[in-house]
A protein has these predicted regions:
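ATP-dependent carboxylate-amine ligase catalytic core
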Residues: 2-17, 23-111, 119-146, 154-158
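C-terminal and late-domain segments of enzyme folds
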Residues: 108, 238-239, 252-265, 269-271, ...
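Internal gly/pro-rich beta-alpha loop/helix module
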Residues: 125-236
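A short, charged/proline- and glycine-enriched loop
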Residues: 1-2, 237-243
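Beta-strand->loop->alpha-helix junctions that form or flank phosphate-binding loops
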Residues: 37-38, 172-180, 269-277
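Phosphate-binding active sites in nucleotide-utilizing proteins
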Residues: 240-317
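A short helix->loop->beta-strand "cap" motif at the edges of active sites that frequently abuts
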Residues: 113, 170, 317-321
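Cysteine-nucleophile active-site neighborhood
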Residues: 295-374
């Protein structure tokens, strides 16, 4: 089985572009590839999914123990001929930027994957060899198996490749030229989502054509051939006992594939709906999940869907088990200011008006602790979370305690009760008791309302 992790010395080196190009090329070759993303990012897996037509999973060693990550990887890779992981940030950049925990290197080390390092030879030549030698020797083993040059000309590749191989001992496996017609734009939370990019499939085809031509495929495939991961025996997915409505559209698109799998494994049927277009919730539901996304970019349309807002407010106030993260939390507030500064009424379930803070707010990983029992949490428990948002609310809640793993910054956040969780923190549900608790609350609600 072909298996590797793509990493880079720093963010902005072209990991996502290179990952998509290689995935498309592997797909064309009949390798039936699957994809994974190191870390908590929601957007890069959307591009993987756009290339492959199958879900991409997140693998995060802050969220999950190594054995859980290995199981998630093996589960996702089962039935595929190639597995490609995309790293995050710089190769060794982990918690707080001062640890290698949860870094791309940590994931490669945990899974035993060869690493292909994506580098841009911009303003460097021999110094690039020194940088690569440093990366290769910084941890033992580094797992670096080869180099891919990004935004590189054929002439530059011909000049650099022999020198880099001689100086570092690492094979240079090829290059991706600069393709202005295949550029993907970005905004305040990273790249545009895959659904928003015009002519995405044509751009992906151009990228795949380029790597087909400029990469030494026999060499790459030989370096990355490994035994398939062993999947532990998994319990059968139980028959669905309750329906959970999951918001999914352009405004609410930050959902992990593993979360939905965990809901199903807990006995729930996942039923999607669009807060932008549907005027009512799905019928006979026992729970409601409102994930994050970009509600601030669609505030007018969300606000004008008054029938759905009224129903959501009424159902939550009647006890419908609900979990709302980040953008979903903002949707339940009093009002949401859009990117142009216009304020729009929202569901009004919670206090608080949300506005653009003009910067990332409480960005990064944290541990979320409960002081009392509720639908999802038990007193004294702690769960890993992350926050990633520019908008902030005048009422973020105080029910839970959050603490960063590096630096120790602390704050209160969230609203909880026996049927409710809402707050800025994104939860990572897989491998925790949270899906079972949510599904149990949903079953109890349906039993009481049938």
């Amino acid at each position: 089985m072909i298996q590797f992790l793509l990493a880079a010395p720093r963010s902005g080196s072209g990991k996502t572009t290179m990952t998509c190009a290689l995935l498309m090329a592997l797909k064309r070759r009949g390798c039936a590839p699957c994809a994974f993303k190191n870390g908590p990012d929601y957007i890069d897996p959307m591009y993987h999914r756009a290339v492959l037509g199958v879900e991409s999973r997140n693998l995060d060693l802050f969220f999950s123990a190594p054995e859980t990550v290995r199981t998630l990887y093996a589960k996702g890779a089962a039935g595929h001929g190639a597995a490609v992981c995309e790293g995050a940030m710089g190769f060794y950049d982990g918690l707080g930027g001062v640890s290698d925990r949860a870094s791309a290197w940590h994931l490669a080390d945990t899974l035993g994957l060869p690493v292909l390092l994506v580098v841009e030879p911009k303003g460097q030549s021999l110094t690039l060899a020194a940088e690569l030698k440093g990366l290769d020797s910084f941890r033992t083993p580094s797992h670096i198996a080869g180099i891919l040059l990004n935004n590189c000309t054929a002439r530059m590749h011909a000049l650099l490749a022999p020198m880099l191989e001689e100086e570092t001992g690492l094979p240079v496996l090829g290059f991706l030229p600069k393709l202005p017609e295949a550029v993907i734009g970005s905004r305040h939370l990273g790249l545009y989502t895959a659904a928003e990019v015009e002519n995405l499939q044509q751009k992906l085809a151009l990228l795949a054509d380029a790597v087909e031509e400029h990469i030494d495929w026999p060499r790459l495939l030989a370096l990355c051939e490994k035994e398939p991961p062993v999947l532990p025996v998994q319990p059968e997915t139980p028959p669905a006992r309750v329906r959970i409505a999951v918001a999914q559209d352009e405004a609410f698109c930050f959902t992990y594939a593993e979360t939905l799998e965990a809901f199903r494994d807990a006995g729930a049927e996942v039923v999607f709906f669009s807060p932008l277009r549907d005027t009512a919730l799905p019928e006979n539901i026992g729970g409601l999940y409102l994930p994050g996304g970009y509600p601030e970019l669609h505030a007018k349309e969300l606000s004008e869907n008054t029938s759905l807002l009224r129903e959501i407010k009424q159902k939550i106030e009647s006890g419908l088990p609900t979990a709302a993260e980040c953008g979903g939390f903002l949707y339940l507030g009093q009002s949401l200011t859009d990117a142009e500064g216009q304020s729009w009424p929202m569901a009004g379930v919670l206090p608080g008006e949300a506005k653009d803070a003009g910067r990332l707010v409480r960005f990064g990983y944290a541990a979320l602790s409960a002081d009392s029992d509720s639908m999802l949490f038990r007193a004294g428990e702690s769960f890993p979370i992350h926050e990633f948002h520019h908008w902030d609310s005048t009422a973020n809640g105080v029910a839970l305690a959050a603490k960063k793993p590096v630096g120790g910054a602390e704050w209160r956040c969230g609203f909880i009760d026996e049927h409710f969780y809402a707050g800025f923190p994104h939860l990572y549900w897989a491998g925790t008791p949270l899906p079972q608790r949510f599904a149990a609350a949903a079953e109890n609600y349906r039993r009481d309302h049938d």
